Design a protein with these regions (language model features):
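Two-component/phosphorelay signaling modules centered on CheY-like receiver
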Residues: 11-33
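Conserved phosphotransfer cores of two-component systems
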Residues: 44-46, 73-80
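Non-catalytic signal-transmission and effector/linker regions of two-component phosphorelay proteins
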Residues: 1-18, 116-128
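Conserved phosphotransfer microenvironments
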Residues: 51-76, 90, 94-98
Length: 128
């Protein structure tokens, strides 16, 4: 089993992503962090394969700067954990551009747009 920690603002969104991951790859075991403060602990205790974090342009602790800092903490705790940011490219094109740049700069392992299909989401996570 590959454990994937989900750190999302919206519970409904996190549940949908959880279901999409399991349906498309039964080897995935999603675990939801209830708060960003819980994320590092969950990644460490579960030996997470990946951390998927929602990024928003307007709220802390879900803004890009705080997500990058949290990703750095997770990498320090679990070096092999892949950091993936999930961004709504239609709601905030500027934020999506900043997330793409974070990938180019090597600050994250990958990013996913909120508009992708569940199968594509699972395929991206599978190939990290």
């Amino acid at each position: 089993m590959r454990r994937i920690v989900l750190d999302m603002q919206c519970t409904l969104f996190a549940d949908a992503i959880s279901q999409a991951l399991v349906v498309n790859d039964p080897d995935f075991e999603p675990i939801r962090a209830e708060t960003p403060e819980e994320t590092v602990r969950l990644c460490r205790s579960s030996f997470a394969y990946a951390l998927i974090m929602e990024v928003t342009g307007y709220h802390t602790p879900w803004n890009l700067e705080e997500r990058l800092a949290l990703g750095k903490q997770v990498k320090a705790a679990v070096l092999s954990c892949k950091i993936v940011l999930l961004v709504d490219e239609k709601a905030d094109e500027s934020l999506a551009s900043q997330v793409r740049q974070a990938k180019k700069d090597g600050l994250i392992d990958n990013f996913i747009y909120a508009s992708v299909s569940p199968a594509y989401l699972s395929a991206v996570i599978d190939t990290l």
